[in-house]
Amino acid sequence: MRHARDFFKPLAVGAPEPLRDIPFRPSRMIHFFPPSNDKMVAKLPDIIPTVDILLGNLEDGVPASDKEAARAGLIRVARTVDMGATQLWTRVNSLDSPWALDDLTAIVTEAGNAFDVIMIPKVEGPEDIHYVDRLLAQLEAKARLSKPILLHAILETARG
């Protein structure tokens, strides 16, 4: 357990310092898109100026056979599409899936500076958030990110 005096210290050597104030930007519209669908990805430049958040969905809306293609498509979007003032978020696979670790590792190390928030679905308790927070700090340090990626926990179960 971390002491309160350490709250604003990075969780890993070389990780970006945690934000002292959460940046609040009102969000009227979040557009979810499937990164493995090339037709939808082609429409993103027209959609981006009309939304506050663009969210690449890697979770339940993506069939198991398309998980890796969706992850690669999301990273390609993060690297190549001009987001302007629109935030880029992603909803990764749940922590009990075989894809969650690969999602987090690839997103942060290959395109981390492009992402504002990572949604963690099906959070069961504080231990899930602590795990992802610590892992994210290590990956941010490894990738030498200039800013931390924020987490958005989704509580979807009776325990969560």
PLM feature spans:
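Conserved alpha/beta-domain cores
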Residues: R2-G160
